Curated annotation (Swiss-Prot):
Domain of life: Bacteria
Classification via InterPro entries: AA-Vitamin_Transporters, EamA_dom
Family note: Belongs to the EamA transporter family.
Domain EamA per the UniProt entry, residue ranges: 18-141, 161-287
Main location: membrane
Gene from which this protein is expressed: yvbV
GO (cellular component) term, any one: plasma membrane
Entry keyword annotation includes Signal: no
Name of the protein this chain belongs to: Uncharacterized transporter YvbV
Record keywords, A-Z: Cell membrane, Membrane, Repeat, Transmembrane, Transmembrane helix, Transport
Transmembrane segments: 11-31, 37-57, 70-90, 97-117, 126-146, 148-168, 180-200, 217-237, 244-264, 265-285
Pfam family, one: EamA
Amino acid sequence: MKQLPKTRTALLLAFLVIMWGVNWPLSKAALAYSPPLLFAGIRTLIGGLLLVIVALPRIHKLRLKETWPIYLVSALLNITLFYGLQTIGLNYLPAGLFSAIVFFQPVLMGVFSWLWLGESMFVMKVIGLILGFAGVAVISAAGFGGHISVIGVLLALGSAVSWALGTVYMKKTGSRVDSIWMVALQLTIGSVFLLISGFWTESFSAIQWTAPFITSLLFISVFVIALGWLVFFTLVGSGEASKVASYTFLIPLISIVASSIFLHEPLTLSLLAGLLLIVTSICLVNTKSKAQKAAAIGINEKAAQ
């Protein structure tokens, strides 16, 4: 895929961080009208089916007989566990606080990439990892005093771990599958597991099909999930993966501000301090070592010759 023009890259990045930022308060508000697993299953199913339609012209790249295990594992980690745990967890914690813990994911991904992908671990990255753990500890500390739900914190961490594992798994296996089919099928397959779990443990009749719920459901399904993931893979495919990673810290910031304005969630000192540590951590984890920078310069010079 060709490198995108700077203006288009900036617009796509802005769209992505805004959509994924407002997703948290919107999801929190929608849970007043629906049980969590059914809500997670319905929104991911709609998003997945929309992307299947987009992917159909690339049906020759599917190769389902050879690649179905990749789609299955990715669906379980990135969709069933990630969306399932986060949607249940939003019942226990404010949306802004929950998103701040979930976006500890880039830090966890740094650890898992080092362990399983052999990616380098240098001083700045180690400092970033330590700050990230400290940030989650600061945010979570109030839970041990009874101020916030420990269950909610654990669900947020579980969501972050499943997303980090899923992302590392996609990095390891991504070259063997088509990126659009990967996200379309992982959403569709993952949604089936969520809906089965929802039908088993929840009641479909408990969903209140009100205008606010339908509006939130469609907005999240279309803009946050379907278009959000399409934009994500467009940016990654054009060589902007590092930019996407470095801008992820804006997502919990937008979530916290939006949750404070629309859901009247409090901005506590521990939340702001923990978020600052996590933001700093993400920035440090996404910095490149001198060797990586030198290698990148060498590649660019060769390309220019």
